[in-house]
Protein backbone atom coordinates (compact mmCIF):
# COMPACT_ATOMS: atom_id res chain seq x y z
CA UNK A 1 0.00 0.00 0.00
CA UNK A 2 0.99 3.64 -0.35
CA UNK A 3 1.61 5.14 3.09
CA UNK A 4 3.12 8.47 2.03
CA UNK A 5 1.83 10.70 -0.78
CA UNK A 6 4.18 13.53 -1.70
CA UNK A 7 3.59 16.48 -4.01
CA UNK A 8 6.60 18.41 -5.30
CA UNK A 9 6.74 22.16 -5.75
CA UNK A 10 8.26 25.39 -4.46
CA UNK A 11 6.84 27.25 -1.43
CA UNK A 12 5.57 30.81 -1.54
CA UNK A 13 2.84 32.72 -3.38
CA UNK A 14 5.15 33.65 -6.27
CA UNK A 15 5.42 29.97 -7.23
CA UNK A 16 1.92 28.79 -6.32
CA UNK A 17 0.45 28.88 -9.84
CA UNK A 18 3.58 27.80 -11.74
CA UNK A 19 3.88 24.54 -13.68
CA UNK A 20 6.59 23.24 -11.33
CA UNK A 21 3.99 23.16 -8.54
CA UNK A 22 1.71 20.60 -10.20
CA UNK A 23 2.62 18.11 -7.47
CA UNK A 24 1.36 20.52 -4.81
CA UNK A 25 -1.89 20.93 -6.75
CA UNK A 26 -2.34 17.16 -6.71
CA UNK A 27 -1.76 16.75 -2.97
CA UNK A 28 -4.13 19.66 -2.30
CA UNK A 29 -6.82 17.82 -4.29
CA UNK A 30 -6.20 14.53 -2.47
CA UNK A 31 -6.37 16.35 0.88
CA UNK A 32 -9.75 17.81 -0.05
CA UNK A 33 -11.04 14.38 -1.08
CA UNK A 34 -9.83 12.77 2.15
CA UNK A 35 -11.06 15.77 4.21
CA UNK A 36 -7.57 16.39 5.56
CA UNK A 37 -5.89 19.67 6.50
CA UNK A 38 -2.19 20.22 5.83
CA UNK A 39 -0.21 21.99 8.53
CA UNK A 40 3.43 22.96 8.96
CA UNK A 41 5.71 20.44 10.67
CA UNK A 42 9.25 21.70 11.23
CA UNK A 43 10.56 18.19 11.95
CA UNK A 44 9.62 17.12 8.41
CA UNK A 45 10.38 20.44 6.67
CA UNK A 46 6.98 20.60 5.04
CA UNK A 47 3.20 20.80 5.15
CA UNK A 48 1.86 17.52 6.50
CA UNK A 49 -1.44 15.76 7.10
CA UNK A 50 -2.12 12.37 8.66
CA UNK A 51 -5.23 10.60 7.41
CA UNK A 52 -6.74 7.53 9.04
CA UNK A 53 -8.08 5.23 6.32
CA UNK A 54 -9.61 1.72 6.36
CA UNK A 55 -6.19 0.32 5.41
CA UNK A 56 -4.24 2.31 8.00
CA UNK A 57 -2.73 5.77 8.47
CA UNK A 58 -1.55 7.64 5.37
CA UNK A 59 0.60 10.74 5.26
CA UNK A 60 0.32 13.64 2.81
CA UNK A 61 3.38 15.84 2.38
CA UNK A 62 4.31 19.04 0.54
CA UNK A 63 8.03 19.76 1.13
CA UNK A 64 8.71 23.42 1.91
CA UNK A 65 12.44 23.15 1.24
CA UNK A 66 12.39 24.34 -2.39
CA UNK A 67 12.40 21.85 -5.21
CA UNK A 68 16.04 20.88 -5.37
CA UNK A 69 16.19 19.74 -1.73
CA UNK A 70 12.81 17.98 -1.59
CA UNK A 71 14.47 14.76 -0.46
CA UNK A 72 15.33 16.27 2.91
CA UNK A 73 11.63 16.50 3.74
CA UNK A 74 10.61 13.16 2.23
CA UNK A 75 13.41 11.23 3.92
CA UNK A 76 12.80 12.83 7.33
CA UNK A 77 9.16 11.72 7.43
CA UNK A 78 9.75 8.33 5.82
CA UNK A 79 12.53 7.39 8.21
CA UNK A 80 10.68 8.49 11.34
CA UNK A 81 7.60 6.43 10.47
CA UNK A 82 9.59 3.57 8.89
CA UNK A 83 7.98 3.98 5.47
CA UNK A 84 9.76 2.00 2.76
CA UNK A 85 10.49 3.57 -0.66
CA UNK A 86 7.97 1.28 -2.37
CA UNK A 87 5.29 2.68 -0.01
CA UNK A 88 5.91 6.24 -1.22
CA UNK A 89 4.18 7.99 -4.14
CA UNK A 90 5.65 11.25 -5.46
CA UNK A 91 3.49 13.44 -7.73
CA UNK A 92 5.48 15.82 -9.92
CA UNK A 93 5.37 17.90 -13.09
CA UNK A 94 6.42 16.03 -16.24
CA UNK A 95 7.82 17.79 -19.31
CA UNK A 96 7.55 14.71 -21.52
CA UNK A 97 3.76 14.46 -21.26
CA UNK A 98 1.28 17.03 -22.63
CA UNK A 99 -1.01 18.91 -20.25
CA UNK A 100 -3.93 16.67 -19.30
CA UNK A 101 -2.04 13.36 -19.42
CA UNK A 102 -0.51 11.44 -16.52
CA UNK A 103 1.47 8.26 -15.99
CA UNK A 104 2.11 6.07 -12.95
CA UNK A 105 5.44 4.29 -12.70
CA UNK A 106 7.77 2.78 -10.13
CA UNK A 107 11.50 3.31 -10.14
CA UNK A 108 13.67 4.65 -12.92
CA UNK A 109 15.85 7.71 -13.30
CA UNK A 110 15.13 11.32 -12.42
CA UNK A 111 15.21 12.55 -16.06
CA UNK A 112 16.80 15.83 -14.98
CA UNK A 113 14.09 16.65 -12.42
CA UNK A 114 16.01 18.02 -9.45
CA UNK A 115 13.27 17.22 -6.96
CA UNK A 116 13.44 13.55 -7.91
CA UNK A 117 17.24 13.73 -8.03
CA UNK A 118 17.37 14.80 -4.38
CA UNK A 119 14.80 12.20 -3.31
CA UNK A 120 16.96 9.53 -4.99
CA UNK A 121 19.96 10.73 -2.99
CA UNK A 122 18.22 11.15 0.37
CA UNK A 123 16.30 7.86 0.28
CA UNK A 124 19.21 5.95 -1.22
CA UNK A 125 16.68 4.23 -3.48
CA UNK A 126 14.77 4.74 -6.71
CA UNK A 127 12.04 2.22 -5.83
CA UNK A 128 9.37 4.78 -4.91
CA UNK A 129 6.33 5.36 -7.13
CA UNK A 130 5.89 8.48 -9.26
CA UNK A 131 2.73 10.08 -10.60
CA UNK A 132 3.92 12.07 -13.62
CA UNK A 133 1.59 15.00 -14.33
CA UNK A 134 2.02 16.33 -17.86
CA UNK A 135 2.80 20.02 -18.27
CA UNK A 136 4.15 19.92 -21.84
CA UNK A 137 7.55 21.06 -23.11
CA UNK A 138 8.58 24.51 -24.37
CA UNK A 139 10.28 22.87 -27.36
CA UNK A 140 13.66 24.41 -26.56
CA UNK A 141 15.87 22.87 -23.87
CA UNK A 142 17.38 26.22 -22.95
CA UNK A 143 13.91 27.51 -22.01
CA UNK A 144 12.96 24.66 -19.65
CA UNK A 145 13.86 26.57 -16.46
CA UNK A 146 11.76 29.59 -17.48
CA UNK A 147 8.95 27.32 -18.64
CA UNK A 148 8.49 25.27 -15.47
CA UNK A 149 8.68 28.42 -13.34
CA UNK A 150 6.05 30.11 -15.49
CA UNK A 151 2.28 29.92 -15.27
CA UNK A 152 0.47 27.72 -17.80
CA UNK A 153 -1.92 29.30 -20.26
CA UNK A 154 -5.56 28.95 -19.23
CA UNK A 155 -6.29 26.02 -21.54
CA UNK A 156 -3.30 24.09 -20.23
CA UNK A 157 -4.15 24.80 -16.58
CA UNK A 158 -7.69 23.58 -17.16
CA UNK A 159 -6.33 20.38 -18.74
CA UNK A 160 -3.99 19.77 -15.80
CA UNK A 161 -6.77 20.42 -13.28
CA UNK A 162 -9.09 18.01 -15.13
CA UNK A 163 -6.31 15.41 -15.11
CA UNK A 164 -5.92 15.80 -11.34
CA UNK A 165 -9.67 15.38 -10.84
CA UNK A 166 -9.61 12.16 -12.89
CA UNK A 167 -6.68 10.88 -10.87
CA UNK A 168 -8.73 10.99 -7.68
CA UNK A 169 -10.65 7.91 -8.85
CA UNK A 170 -7.43 5.94 -8.30
CA UNK A 171 -6.74 7.09 -4.73
CA UNK A 172 -8.51 4.14 -3.08
CA UNK A 173 -6.57 1.68 -5.26
CA UNK A 174 -3.30 3.43 -4.42
CA UNK A 175 -4.01 3.30 -0.71
CA UNK A 176 -4.90 -0.40 -0.82
CA UNK A 177 -1.80 -1.23 -2.85
CA UNK A 178 -3.69 -2.38 -5.94
CA UNK A 179 -1.28 -0.67 -8.31
CA UNK A 180 -2.56 -2.53 -11.38
CA UNK A 181 -6.05 -1.16 -10.77
CA UNK A 182 -4.66 2.31 -10.07
CA UNK A 183 -2.63 2.22 -13.28
CA UNK A 184 -5.67 1.18 -15.29
CA UNK A 185 -7.71 4.07 -13.93
CA UNK A 186 -4.95 6.60 -14.45
CA UNK A 187 -3.94 5.54 -17.95
CA UNK A 188 -7.11 4.53 -19.78
CA UNK A 189 -8.88 7.87 -20.11
CA UNK A 190 -6.92 10.35 -22.21
CA UNK A 191 -8.38 13.81 -22.82
CA UNK A 192 -8.05 15.72 -26.11
CA UNK A 193 -4.64 17.33 -26.27
CA UNK A 194 -4.74 21.08 -25.67
CA UNK A 195 -3.31 23.35 -28.31
CA UNK A 196 0.37 24.27 -27.82
CA UNK A 197 1.09 27.85 -26.73
CA UNK A 198 1.28 30.29 -29.64
CA UNK A 199 4.81 31.72 -30.07
CA UNK A 200 5.07 35.45 -29.50
CA UNK A 201 7.38 37.24 -31.93
CA UNK A 202 10.23 39.26 -30.48
CA UNK A 203 9.64 42.90 -31.40
CA UNK A 204 11.45 43.96 -34.54
CA UNK A 205 12.87 40.51 -35.35
CA UNK A 206 10.00 38.30 -36.46
CA UNK A 207 11.61 35.53 -34.40
CA UNK A 208 9.28 33.69 -31.98
CA UNK A 209 10.19 33.94 -28.33
CA UNK A 210 10.37 30.53 -26.64
CA UNK A 211 9.79 31.64 -23.07
CA UNK A 212 6.28 32.40 -21.92
CA UNK A 213 7.02 33.74 -18.46
CA UNK A 214 9.67 35.80 -16.68
CA UNK A 215 12.26 34.13 -14.52
CA UNK A 216 11.37 33.80 -10.86
CA UNK A 217 13.30 36.22 -8.64
CA UNK A 218 16.15 34.97 -6.48
CA UNK A 219 15.21 34.58 -2.83
CA UNK A 220 17.95 35.59 -0.44
CA UNK A 221 18.93 32.98 2.08
CA UNK A 222 16.99 30.15 0.47
CA UNK A 223 17.87 27.20 -1.68
CA UNK A 224 17.41 28.03 -5.37
CA UNK A 225 14.32 26.62 -7.05
CA UNK A 226 16.18 24.61 -9.65
CA UNK A 227 14.27 22.60 -12.16
CA UNK A 228 14.01 19.86 -14.70
CA UNK A 229 16.64 20.27 -17.35
CA UNK A 230 19.10 22.16 -15.11
CA UNK A 231 22.69 20.89 -15.19
CA UNK A 232 23.61 18.72 -12.21
From Swiss-Prot:
The keyword Amino-acid biosynthesis does not apply. The keyword Magnesium does not apply. Its main location: cytoplasm. The record marks 93 as: Stabilizes the basic form of H active site to accept a proton. It catalyses: an N-acyl-L-alpha-aminoacyl-tRNA + H2O = an N-acyl-L-amino acid + a tRNA + H(+). GO terms for cellular component: cytoplasm. Residues 200-220 have a biased composition (Low complexity). GO terms for biological process: protein quality control for misfolded or incompletely synthesized proteins; rescue of stalled ribosome. The active site is at residue 20. Coiled coil: none annotated. It comes from the Bacteria. Its EC number is 3.1.1.29. TRNA binds at residues 15, 66, 68, 114. Residues 187-196 have a biased composition (Basic residues). Residues 186-232 are annotated as: Disordered. It is found in: Cytoplasm. It is an enzyme of class 3 (hydrolase). GO terms for molecular function: peptidyl-tRNA hydrolase activity; tRNA binding. Pfam families: Pept_tRNA_hydro. The record marks 10 as: Discriminates between blocked and unblocked aminoacyl-tRNA. InterPro entries: Pept_tRNA_hydro, Pept_tRNA_hydro_CS, Pept_tRNA_hydro_sf. Keywords: Cytoplasm, Hydrolase, RNA-binding, tRNA-binding. Belongs to the PTH family. Monomer. Hydrolyzes ribosome-free peptidyl-tRNAs (with 1 or more amino acids incorporated), which drop off the ribosome during protein synthesis, or as a result of ribosome stalling. This is Peptidyl-tRNA hydrolase. It comes from Methylibium petroleiphilum (strain ATCC BAA-1232 / LMG 22953 / PM1).
